[in-house]
Structure formats: structure tokens, C-alpha cells
């Protein structure tokens, strides 16, 4: 029971000290800080628009009303960007597939050449010169 009282009393004391320190720092704001806050308010007003302007900006236009030029340009830029990304993706896929097919074709040609060469060596009877020396077109 005494530990609970000690913990409760120390947390209450810490809370009171924090409140007093916060009030002390807020009361000691100098003229420089006040001027800086005034400048910051001016900057905020330049950055942020009025609430009425913001609500008008965010209102959706009617379905039948024509799109503004900015909307059309933004949609066209987005569409062109999507087309370019799609084109790059399919080009990359096509290149990978062409490389794969070329490797498969090379492997198949190598296997076929080896099989034909083995067949010729097995069936060579010694009466004729070997195939390599008997080619018509070199």
C-alpha cells in the first residue's frame, strides 16, 4: 500500500512540475519569437487557400459539364505515361522470351548435330570418305 502511495505522489509531483514549466516557457516568449510567429502566419496564408476556395476547388464538376484544359492535359499525361510503362513492360517480356527461344533453339541444334554426327560415325563403313570431307557446299 505504501508503494502505491509513493508512486502516485511522485507521478502527481512530476505532472505539476511539467505544467509549471510549460506555463513558464510560454510566458517567456520574447518579441523576436512573436515576430517570427507573425511571419509564419503570413507564410501559412500564402501557402494555404481560404476555406471557401478550397471547397470550390474540391467540388466535383457535373457529368455533363466539359472538362477543364488542365484536367484534359493531366489525363493525357497519365495516359501517355501508362502507355509508355506498358510498352516498356511488353518490350522487356518480348526480349526475354526471344532470348529464351534462341537459347532453346541453339540447344536443340547442338543436340541434333551431335546425334547426326554420332549416327554418321556409327554407320560409317570406311568405303567412302567421312561426311566432313565429302560436303558439296562449304
Curated annotation (Swiss-Prot):
Its predominant location is: secreted
Pfam families in UniProt: UCMA
Q: What induces it?
A: Expression inhibited by TGFB1, and weakly inhibited by BMP2.
Q: Where is this region: Disordered?
A: 58-78
Which keywords describe this protein according to UniProt?
A: Coiled coil, Cytoplasm, Cytoskeleton, Extracellular matrix, Golgi apparatus, Secreted, Signal, Sulfation
Where does the record place a coiled coil?
78-122
Family matches, as InterPro entries: UCMA
Q: Name one GO biological process term.
A: osteoblast differentiation
Signal peptide range: 1-27
Compartment list: Secreted, Extracellular space, Extracellular matrix
- Report a single Gene Ontology molecular function: BMP binding
Biased composition, class Basic and acidic residues, residue ranges: 67-78
The record's Gene Ontology cellular component field reads: aggresome; cytoplasm; cytoskeleton; extracellular matrix; extracellular region; extracellular space; Golgi apparatus; perinuclear region of cytoplasm
Report residue numbers covered by any propeptide. Answer: 28-64
Write out the PTM section of this UniProt entry. Proteolytically cleaved by a furin-like convertase to generate a persistent C-terminal fragment found in almost the entire cartilage matrix, and affecting osteoblast differentiation.
| Top-level taxon of the source organism | Eukaryota
- Provide the tissue specificity: Predominantly expressed in resting chondrocytes.
Role, per record: May be involved in the negative control of osteogenic differentiation of osteochondrogenic precursor cells in peripheral zones of fetal cartilage and at the cartilage-bone interface.
Member of which family? Belongs to the UCMA family.
* Name of this chain's protein: Unique cartilage matrix-associated protein
Q: Which organism is it from?
A: Mus musculus
Q: What is the lineage of its organism?
A: Eukaryota, Metazoa, Chordata, Craniata, Vertebrata
Amino acid at each position: 500500500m505504501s508503494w502505491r502511495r509513493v508512486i502516485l505522489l511522485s507521478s502527481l509531483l512530476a505532472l505539476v512540475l511539467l505544467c509549471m514549466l510549460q506555463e513558464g516557457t510560454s510566458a517567456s516568449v520574447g518579441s523576436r519569437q512573436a515576430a517570427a510567429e507573425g511571419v509564419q502566419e503570413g507564410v501559412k496564408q500564402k501557402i494555404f487557400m481560404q476555406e471557401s476556395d478550397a471547397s470550390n476547388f474540391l467540388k466535383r464538376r457535373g457529368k455533363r459539364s466539359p472538362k477543364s484544359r488542365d484536367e484534359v492535359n493531366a489525363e493525357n499525361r497519365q495516359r501517355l505515361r501508362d502507355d509508355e510503362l506498358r510498352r516498356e513492360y511488353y518490350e522487356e517480356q518480348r526480349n526475354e522470351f526471344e532470348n529464351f527461344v534462341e537459347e532453346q533453339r541453339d540447344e536443340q541444334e547442338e543436340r541434333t548435330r551431335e546425334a547426326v554426327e554420332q549416327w554418321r560415325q556409327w554407320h560409317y563403313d570406311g568405303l567412302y570418305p567421312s561426311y566432313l570431307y565429302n560436303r558439296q557446299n562449304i
